From Swiss-Prot:
Keyword tRNA processing: yes
Gene3D superfamilies (alphabetical): 3.40.1280.10, tRNA(m1g37)methyltransferase, domain 2 (1.10.1270.20)
EC number: 2.1.1.228
Source lineage: Bacteria, Pseudomonadati, Pseudomonadota, Gammaproteobacteria, Pseudomonadales
The protein's name in its UniProt record: tRNA (guanine-N(1)-)-methyltransferase
Record note on quaternary structure: Homodimer.
Annotated source species: Pseudomonas entomophila (strain L48)
A cellular component term, taken from the record's GO annotations: cytosol
Protein keywords: Cytoplasm, Methyltransferase, S-adenosyl-L-methionine, Transferase, tRNA processing
Localization per record: Cytoplasm
Chief localization: cytoplasm
Length: 250
């Protein structure tokens, strides 16, 4: 009997008792079909306050999760489950989690889920370590734990022996909107990767323009359907064209 191993990087591991102690997923754990292990980035900090977040470069509200505690927690998860495990970040910027996508994930031997908090996680962690980003809808939650539990629940239902049949319920559609821009926090340089200069400039007008351009570009590349019902202003069209020119020239 195969066991799906799910490693979760989260600041709130106790939340996942909802998966391991209740319902179909709990039964799957008891049957040996599912194993869920949590890794808390706070356990990998070195300061007395166990700091896992910092202010975003370029200003703005909220905090951004720091890269080093995330990397160290991920390293432990990889060691436990194997380097081949797919790393998934639960994010409103990700692709829509459909039943077809869940079927593919259910075929994996192991998964590593990253549950963010605050304004998100340092973009450099995503670029370096995340294989896929998945979203459960175009709405705001306090963190990635609930989406991670949704994914685990949906995948578990497709494991042979967990249900006795496959649930093929349809997923709800997204509402319209733009995806978020990249976020960065300290350090300014990590593994030879620099934060974009505009975010260090202190010029708030330039920062706002850069963020809107990145948001438009990401939406065009990842969720072009969201732009179909959105009327872009002249400035937004100009920014999107500029983004595409810069992308093609790079």
């Amino acid at each position: 009997m195969d066991t799906l191993r799910v490693e979760v990087v989260t600041l709130f591991p106790e939340m996942f008792s909802a998966i391991t102690e209740y319902g179909i997923t709990s039964r799957a754990v008891k049957q040996g079909l599912l194993q869920v292990t949590c890794w808390n980035p706070r356990d990998y900090t070195t300061d007395r306050h166990h700091t896992v977040d910092d202010r975003p470069f370029g200003g703005g509200p909220g905090m951004v999760m720091k890269i080093k505690p995330l990397e160290d927690a991920l390293a432990s998860a990889r060691q436990a489950t194997g380097a081949a495990a797919k790393v998934i970040y639960l994010s409103p910027q990700g692709r829509k989690l459909t039943q077809q996508a869940v079927k593919g994930l259910a075929e994996q031997e192991s998964l590593i889920l990253i549950a963010g908090r605050y304004e998100g996680i340092d973009e450099r962690f995503i670029e370096a370590h995340v294989d896929e980003e998945w979203s459960i809808g175009d709405y705001v939650l306090s963190g990635g734990e609930l989406p991670a539990m949704v994914l685990i629940d949906a995948v578990t239902r497709l494991l042979p022996g967990a249900l006795g049949h496959v649930d093929s319920a349809e997923e709800d559609s997204f509402t319209d909107g733009l995806l978020d821009c990249p976020h960065y926090t300290r350090p300014e340089v990590y593994a030879d990767q620099r934060v974009p200069d505009v975010l260090l400039s202190g010029n708030h007008a330039h920062i706002r323009r850069w963020r809107m351009k990145q948001s438009l570009g990401r939406t065009f590349e990842r969720r072009a359907d969201l732009l179909e019902s959105r009327s872009l202003s002249g400035e937004e069209k100009k920014l999107l064209e500029e983004y595409l020119r810069e992308r093609d020239d790079s």
